[in-house]
Amino acid sequence: MGVIPCAIIGLLLDNIIEDYLSKNIVIAITLILYGMIFIFVEKHPKKEKIQTIERLDYKSALKIGCFQCLALIPGTSRSGATILGGLYCGCSRTVASEFSFFLAIPVMFGATLLKVIKYLMKVGLFSFGQLFLLVLGTFVAFVVSLFAIKALLNYVKNHDFTVFGWYRIILGIFVILFFYIL
């Protein structure tokens, strides 16, 4: 259920998003905005009603999927948007994070498949070397992501997301400085 909204919106608006929103200023603003939202959410927490992923119902999953659509805007973290959606729906940090990573699998696969199809239609078939690098890169990214997910899930059991909020704000300011001031 959580994947459906993003799949529909992503397919319908892919070119528009790529043409109009893939700007450094949009990325900087969304980095800062979501950083502020993370800090706000941590300072004003909702009551945690959902303590285990098994208690997550279809309605909440669909709502979290709608939050995932926000990640179509460049600079928005897909996992950040879905974690915020989970917290909004009353999930614990751990459940929100776990569900966010479950949602990533079909969305990342679908987005990658769409980009590969666009590439094939525009350029043609991959060379053997390109195909090898694509498969190797995918495998390495998958293995590294498993370690990163495990580390993040361990982190959120004992910490909040405030540090991620500040990280996003600082990175957004750096993007503005780098591309518009320096």
PLM feature segments, named:
Residues 1-182:
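Multi-pass membrane proteins that catalyze or facilitate reactions on polyprenyl-/lipid-phosphate substrates
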